[in-house]
Amino acid sequence: MLDQKLIRENPTFVEDNLSLRGKVYDIARIRELSLERKEIDTEISSLQSESKKLSKIIGQEIRNSNINSKELNELKDKGNKYRIKVSEFEEQKRILDKQLQDEISKLPNLPSKDAPLGENENNNIQIKEWGDPLTKDNLKAHWEIGENLNLFDSVKSTKISKSRFITLTGNGARLERALVNFMLDVHSNNGYLELMPPALVNSESLQGSGQLPKFSNESFKCANDDLWLSPTAEVPLTAFHKNEIIDPKILPLKYVAYSPCFRREAGSYGRDTKGLIRLHQFNKVELYWFCHPNKSLEAHKEITADAESILKKLNLPYRSVDICTGDLGFSSSRTFDLEVWLPSSQCYREISSCSNCLDFQARRSSIRTKIDKKTSYIHTLNGSGLAIGRTMAAILENGQQLDGSVKIPDALVPYFGSSFIKTT
């Protein structure tokens, strides 16, 4: 959530920066509500001050026996009127706060001044490439490899649920489990505390991380409860410290969580209908940081490097990309994407987004720390470390052999228990 004071005092700056996302945001109504709320705060403070003075006068007059009952009742009536007026203003403020919350929650984060300017993904800037992309002819797509090796079944999954669900079978399930354990071990050994959060989250948690209200159509909601299937572990990890003041001495807090993720993919009709790339349910290992506001720029580089380390250990070719202002996620100020090489399509596909959200999520979730004896909002960062299904797809395609088998990356062999997945 953006700072009300910034919107109120520097609206042009806010509008100009939001426009870099490629959309016009009118903040006049928000500024009007914010100014009105500030005026009410001033009125309340003034009335409370007058009421306090009056109480002192009444007390002094009673102690000195300088007041009769009629005068005393008149003063008490005046005090009651002050309290009634304060109560009325408090109710107005409550209504204004709700309106402000609703309006401000629709505004995305301000892009970082360091994010490249651009309208869409075509304007993203490649930072670097790593590894040697496989470019042979007649390479199979991962779904063909998976079907040939009996690693998953999408037909039966459609009977169980509907399209865009998949059941991993045999070595497919085994490979998924191996990847999860491998990623969790790598990150845990790198200073992350492992959490296993709930898969169901409430609306307040989704609001806090920035998924609501904008992405309500992209999520699955329970019919009879204020609960949603979590679209990413970023949601419960943000909410883990909701409404807390964190001791600066223990920062940064670094968490890693494996979780199922659920997305409706409402806007992806006709795209990636086969395989593991775009499913309604998928598994992901998520990295999440709570850090000192002065340290988030360095933390962003570090969390990205931590996600990259998985790709390097698995020897999967990838590139890193600096996301332009028009392609940034709602809560992000700056994002570095990691894209893994998929030989069958001769292109890179996103496998991790590592984002610095500054204090945007912390404001929405009321997560603060103490800096120079003052309470300040903390900074949050998140990144996939990695998406399991897409990692599996990359291993199948980059590790495919002429005999139809798949070579397992050396670092994964102790977890998988074999160097190859072979036809039976």
Curated annotation (Swiss-Prot):
Residues at which ATP binds: R263, R264, E265, E350, I351, S352, S353
CDD domains associated with the record: SerRS_core (cd00770)
One Pfam family here: Seryl_tRNA_N
GO molecular function, one term: serine-tRNA ligase activity
Protein location: Cytoplasm
Any GO BP annotation: seryl-tRNA aminoacylation
Keywords assigned by UniProt, alphabetized: Aminoacyl-tRNA synthetase, ATP-binding, Cytoplasm, Ligase, Nucleotide-binding, Protein biosynthesis
Documented EC number(s): 6.1.1.11
UniProt entry tagged with the keyword Acyltransferase: no
Record keyword Nucleotide-binding present: yes
Binding site for L-serine: T232, A233, E234, E286, S384
Catalyzed reactions: tRNA(Ser) + L-serine + ATP = L-seryl-tRNA(Ser) + AMP + diphosphate + H(+); tRNA(Sec) + L-serine + ATP = L-seryl-tRNA(Sec) + AMP + diphosphate + H(+)
Function per UniProt: Catalyzes the attachment of serine to tRNA(Ser). Is also able to aminoacylate tRNA(Sec) with serine, to form the misacylated tRNA L-seryl-tRNA(Sec), which will be further converted into selenocysteinyl-tRNA(Sec).
NCBIfam families (UniProt xref): serS
Subunit comment: Homodimer. The tRNA molecule binds across the dimer.
Protein family according to the UniProt entry: Belongs to the class-II aminoacyl-tRNA synthetase family. Type-1 seryl-tRNA synthetase subfamily.
Domain notes: Consists of two distinct domains, a catalytic core and a N-terminal extension that is involved in tRNA binding.
UniProt name for this protein: Serine--tRNA ligase
